[in-house]
Amino acid sequence: MKRIILASGSPRRRELLSQIGLEFTVITSEADEHTSIKEPARYVEYLSSVKAEAVHDMLQNVLTDKDNDIKLSGEWYNDIMAGSYVIIGADTIVSHKGHILTKPKDTGNAFDILKELAGDCHQVYTGVTLIKNNNVVSNFAEKTDVYCNDISDNEIREYISTGEPMDKAGAYGIQGRFAAFIGKIDGDYNNVVGLPVARVYQELKLWLN
């Protein structure tokens, strides 16, 4: 069995992978996440690949003694040397009428984002990249349509005051208090949380053994 490496510090992605019974290790990087790509699906596909490839490069540097930030046990070292691992990179964004919405810069930006989403349908895209044996073996984007109910300005301010929106794409967490404002979704709920685990699992089955 190959080792699974999650190239993300997101607690929500960790919870989702644990929820389906997978054992994995988290390794994060300081990948450059700037891109001029405007199309939502391509945007997340690209950034998920950047994150996965950055962690892959870190592991290769460990093997050549160029990076001492990651300490590997002997068993881990042998598995990495043998290419016996799969890296999962992921990136999630919200898109409204083609406008990409990432994490809010401040509370004012969070208010503007939530005001834009209120009473309308938007899309959540999560891009996923799998790397095995130095090769990208899977790179895809999953889309979910999310319909928000009307939200008053006071409700938006109260929600922002909880601090919940500030580290989330689109300034909300569907698994948190914002669930009160969701009318319906079309697609994978877990994709909105941060990772389409059902599809990820199916992809992993192709490459883990």
Q: Where are these predicted regions, by residue range?
A:
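Short, glycine/serine-rich, charged loops/turns that create anion-binding
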Residues: 11, 31, 135
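Short, acidic/turn-prone active-site loops that include or flank metal/cofactor-
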Residues: 28-34
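Anionic-ligand binding patches
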Residues: 2-3, 26, 41-209
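N-terminal beta1-alpha1 ligand-phosphate binding loop
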Residues: 2-22, 28
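Short Asp/Glu-rich motifs
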Residues: 35-36, 178
